[in-house]
């Protein structure tokens, strides 16, 4: 893949008002994407967003650029990222655009594209858009300008899609569920899905004002959800992130159930029903206990680099349909083409309803090993992980942990940091080993 100036692993992202998340760049990006897509015969693009106040500005700029290139835009309003992937397919749109910075604060935003199939744009299309961004803007003839329209029933369509992934012979009657929508894009979707399946729903994080997305709520901070589940004696709590592609859960005792445990529950249920295709893809950060639990079921497990994009790539390489991250990105490829928080949570709720078991009981098969993470700042220049001294200490630690844990040493891609992660059943040993490696890295500085 060629070096990109604008597109990262998850589209274009940054702080609002700072290049490239500016109205003039969004206008140019809309035009460039429009020119490239129009050359492929495209006529219409879907545009969705989360609840950030900057979404209004960016969607208007994108639409103007697309129109200048001769493409029409259909707005969905605030919708989860996976909903745009789904609607792009069902509307037969040539592409979908999502304006979101996912789990980031309100002052960040981003723009990413889906193909007509609801997957990431092919590399060659992204590269063509990047090349077009270097060209001066022009405008098609007046009669060929694009139009703008609104899809008024977008939410209803996606609600029906989500409900359709839940087994028809099961319901959620008798379940009390607390749902935290992070004041984000699922605020008008998830509560309705759950109610229509029969659950009693208590809502938090469903009052977006443009500035409170992901603020002390949602999948990245389940503290409020844990308290509400215990206070209301609910059966389960669900926390989505700002754009609805992540899920974290809380059991009836207030314990957090993370992406690794959720992935295991879904995998075991798929195995029992004969629907598991191949194995499961996790990441370098997936807890060792997940790997061990899957091994006990005879389920193959592979690790991808961190990032849902890389998880999906490895799934496609192996023709598997299930993968995810401990952060709560869960991809069930036979249901949607991208991580879908609502769909993943429904898969877990279906397992609870099917077996009359609590989330606590279902998650107990994966007793997460303690993870110790130490970030060590270095002066830049040579990578400390290439040092013989660090390699020697790391090798000695690995020998001590053999069979009981593992280490992961990574150089940050964005900062001069070495990330030292040690995972072990024995928390004290994990801490001790992490400190030894971190000390060796510091000495190189």
UniProtKB/Swiss-Prot annotation:
- Which catalytic residues are annotated? 102 (phosphoserine intermediate)
* UniProt record, GO biological process: carbohydrate metabolic process; peptidoglycan biosynthetic process; UDP-N-acetylglucosamine biosynthetic process
Cystine pairs = none
Any GO CC annotation of this UniProt entry: cytosol
Listed EC numbers: 5.4.2.10
Q: Can you quote the record's cofactor note?
A: Binds 1 Mg(2+) ion per subunit.
Query: Which terms does the record give in the GO molecular function aspect?
Result: magnesium ion binding; phosphoglucosamine mutase activity; phosphomannomutase activity
Entry keywords, A to Z: Isomerase, Magnesium, Metal-binding, Phosphoprotein
Q: Which InterPro entries match?
A: A-D-PHexomutase_a/b/a-I, A-D-PHexomutase_a/b/a-I/II/III, A-D-PHexomutase_a/b/a-II, A-D-PHexomutase_a/b/a-III, A-D-PHexomutase_C, A-D-PHexomutase_C_sf, A-D-PHexomutase_CS, Alpha-D-phosphohexomutase_SF
Superkingdom of the source species: Bacteria
Q: Which SUPFAM superfamilies match?
A: Phosphoglucomutase, C-terminal domain, Phosphoglucomutase, first 3 domains
**Which CDD domains does this UniProt record tie to the protein?**
GlmM
Q: What class of enzyme is it?
A: isomerase
Q: Which reaction does it catalyse?
A: alpha-D-glucosamine 1-phosphate = D-glucosamine 6-phosphate
User: Which residues are reported to carry the modification Phosphoserine?
Assistant: 102
Q: Which cofactor does it need?
A: Mg(2+)
Modification after translation, per record:
Activated by phosphorylation.
Binding of Mg(2+) occurs at 102, 241, 243, 245
Tell me which Gene3D superfamilies the record gives: Alpha-D-Glucose-1,6-Bisphosphate, subunit A, domain 3 (3.40.120.10), Alpha-D-phosphohexomutase, C-terminal domain (3.30.310.50)
Q: What does this protein do?
A: Catalyzes the conversion of glucosamine-6-phosphate to glucosamine-1-phosphate.
Per the similarity annotation, which family is this? Belongs to the phosphohexose mutase family.
Q: What is this protein called?
A: Phosphoglucosamine mutase
């Amino acid at each position: 893949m060629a070096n990109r100036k604008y597109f990262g692993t998850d589209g274009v992202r940054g702080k609002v008002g700072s290049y490239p998340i500016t109205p003039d760049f969004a206008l140019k990006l809309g035009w460039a994407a429009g020119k490239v897509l129009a050359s492929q015969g495209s006529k219409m693009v879907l545009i969705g967003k989360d609840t950030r106040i900057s979404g209004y500005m960016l969607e208007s700029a994108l639409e103007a650029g697309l129109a200048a290139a001769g493409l029409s835009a259909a707005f969905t309003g605030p919708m989860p990222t996976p909903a745009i992937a789904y609607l792009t397919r069902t509307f037969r749109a040539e592409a979908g655009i999502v304006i979101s910075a996912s789990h980031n604060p309100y002052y960040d935003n981003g723009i990413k594209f889906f193909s007509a199939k609801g997957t990431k744009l092919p590399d060659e299309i992204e590269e063509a858009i990047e090349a077009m961004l270097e060209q001066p803007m022009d405008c098609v003839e007046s009669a060929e300008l694009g139009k703008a329209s609104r899809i008024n029933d977008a939410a209803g369509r996606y609600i029906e899609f989500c409900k359709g992934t839940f087994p028809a012979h099961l319901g959620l009657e008798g379940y009390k569920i607390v749902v935290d929508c992070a004041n984000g894009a699922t605020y008008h979707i998830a509560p309705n899905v759950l109610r229509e399946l029969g659950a009693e729903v208590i809502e938090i994080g469903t009052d977006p004002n443009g500035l409170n997305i992901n603020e002390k709520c949602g999948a990245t901070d389940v503290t409020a959800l844990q308290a509400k589940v215990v206070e209301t004696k609910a059966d389960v709590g669900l926390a989505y992130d700002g754009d609805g592609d992540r899920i974290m859960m809380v059991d009836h005792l207030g314990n957090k159930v993370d992406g690794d445990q959720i992935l295991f529950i879904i995998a075991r249920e798929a195995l029992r029903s004969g629907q598991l295709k191949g194995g499961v893809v996790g990441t370098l950060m997936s807890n060792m206990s997940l790997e061990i639990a899957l091994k006990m079921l005879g389920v193959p497990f592979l690790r991808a680099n961190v990032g849902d994009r890389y998880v999906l790539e490895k799934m496609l390489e192996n023709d598997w349909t299930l993968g995810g991250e401990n952060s709560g990105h869960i991809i069930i490829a036979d249901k949607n083409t991208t991580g879908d928080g609502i769909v993943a949570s429904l898969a877990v709720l279906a397992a609870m309803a099917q077996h009359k078991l609590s989330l606590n009981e279902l998650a107990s098969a994966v007793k997460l090993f303690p993870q110790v993470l130490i970030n060590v700042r270095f002066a830049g220049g040579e990578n400390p992980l290439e040092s013989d001294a660090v390699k020697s200490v790391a090798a000695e630690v690995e020998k001590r942990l053999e069979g009981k844990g593992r280490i992961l040493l990574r150089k940050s891609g964005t900062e001069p940091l070495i990330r030292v992660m040690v995972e072990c059943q024995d928390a004290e040993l994990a801490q001790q080993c992490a400190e030894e490696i971190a000390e060796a890295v510091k000495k190189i500085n």
